[in-house]
Structures are given as C-alpha cells and as structure tokens.
Amino acid sequence: MKKILFTGGGSAGHAVPNLALIEELLSKGKTDVCYMGTDGIEKSIIAAQKIPYYTIDCPKLVRGKSFTALKNNLHIPCAFQKAVTEAQKGLEIFRPDLIFSKGGYVALPVVFAAKKLHIPCVAHESDFSLGLANRLSANKCKTVLTSFPETANKLKNGKYGGAPIRRTVLSAKREDARRALGIGEREKVLLVFGGGSGSKAINDALRKSLKSLTDKYLVLHVCGKGNVVESTVKNYRQYEFIADMGTMYACADLVLSRAGAGTVFEILALKKPSLLVPLEGATRGDQKQNAEYFRAKGLCRVLPQNQLPSLEEEIDKVFADTDMKQRLLENTFSQGNERILGEINALLYG
C-alpha cells in the first residue's frame, strides 16, 4: 500500500484543508496516511484521525525590525538546519511515497528534507498569493496546486486544483441543523467568527451593536477561546470554538468573518452571503487580496477593519442584497477535493 505524508501548520488554515483530504483518503482505505508537524494547533486538529504523527521543532520567522524580531531571527539558520535533520529522520521512519505540503513554517524543512531523500512533493496554496513557505519550496515540488486559477498561471509548475473542504461542512442540511440548535425556520441567523482563535476587533464591534442587531437577527458568535463574556442579551449565543462548522454554516443566512482562504471558499461553496473583514497587518496582505478578488466578482461585501463602527449598517446591506444572492447561486467556485485527490493518485499510482 502506498503511503503519503501530509505537512503544514502554524494555524488552522494550514491544517484543516489537510484534514479534508486525509478524511477522504482514509475513507477509501487504499492509502496509508501520516503527518509531520509541530506540537501546535495542527497536532490537535489531526489527532482525531488517529494516524501516525511525527513532531518536529521548527523556527518561525518573526516579521519586522524590532529588537525582539532581530534577536529571534539570528537563530533561524541553525534552527532551520536542525529542523531539516529532524524531518529527515522522520521521513526515514515513515518512508512515504509522496509528501503533500499545505504550507506554513513547519512545511519548509519537511520539503527540504524530502528533496534530499528524493521523495516527490506536491504543495497546495489556498491564498491568492503564495505564502513564504510555498514560495521558498515551490521549485522543490513536482506540482504546486492552487485554489485560485490565476495563481497557478504565475508558476512554472502551477496547476489549478481548487480548495479542499471537509465533507462535514458540505453535507450539513439547514433543516437538520436548525432543529439540532433549536432555531426556528423563519429566524434570520447571523453567524460571526474571526478565525481559529477569534478576533478581538470583530468581537468588540459586534458586542457594541449587539442590542440593535439582536432585535433583527439571531446571532451565533464563535468568539474564540477565553473570549466568552457574560451576557443576558436575547437572540445571542456565544461559543469558544466549534469543531462542526458545517452545522453552524447550515443554520446561517449570512456570515461575518475574516477573509482567510479556507473560510472564504467554504462560504462560497455553500453559497452564503458574507461580509468579510480582512485581517489588518497580515504579512503580505493575503486576506485583503482574497476578499477583494471575490468582492470584484460581486460574491461578497468587504468591510475594512477601521470601518467596523459601521458594522450594523453593512450587515443590513448584505441581508438586503438580492443581486449578490443570485450571483452566489450561479457561482462556479466549489470544493476541489476530487481534483486534488486525482493529482495525488496520479503521482502515487501512475
């Protein structure tokens, strides 16, 4: 039986797409699967699959010119070489036939180690522009699959694959989800979340407008670990974290969220109207690029973080935007699981 090793982490956005593909491969039972990552969030996300997991210590570049950043980054060359050596040891134990890299800082030493051992690699980039790890490792991969067609066209070995999305997200039904959460069919539901650890800016802006918003909508707020506050406001439900986002999406009439690629493609695949608040100060402006791409196609609205005081007004506009809802019904962006798995199987089995 052929074996594939997945890598990628540092944030949920690098690990959850891997999880979507791992679940598909395990359900077919034809391929052994293992994972290499840090002891961080990717390990907790992958743990439920009960597959072999090899942990490596990997240095993370600190952006900026502060003393703390400079001090940290001085150690990166030595720490990176150590991480490559650790990754090589893990690969020699697992002996995979193929590496699938989802990016993030942990993926880079794994791809470098795989190159030394002549193990073929496939990378996947979810965002409109390549992240640092994928930029540095692209020439060591046989193929770089992308979620955006335009991104693939910029790479010699680029190929459009689409976005991996978990089946549990795609399969949840509105009627079943609302029944499970005790939500009436006619209630207007606003789903709010700010990424894997929540967003203080979104949380604060939402709560300032909460009383008037909950007069019109039932608000489901995934606010992040440690961010639940005492509240007696009716039509407001708080959650630290939700593992089954499929149920939450299925209930929602509108989604307010950050603009990470994984989230945006889930929203589009489910044809949900959305108001996106791109993360400010991101290293390459990836969330702004993602959001602007789909805003230009009329598939979402975008609210810059410095305009969050107008949140309620913008939410009302999205609910009233019938043209957007029609465009969403007609949009052709869907999950890329089958295309990506086709590429994997072609490399594994020829």
Role assignments for model-derived ranges:
Residues R301, N306-T332, G350:
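Conserved donor-nucleotide binding/catalytic region of nucleotide-linked donor-dependent transferases
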Residues T85-I99, A107-V122, R135, N139-T143:
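Glycosyltransferases and closely related glycan-assembly transferases
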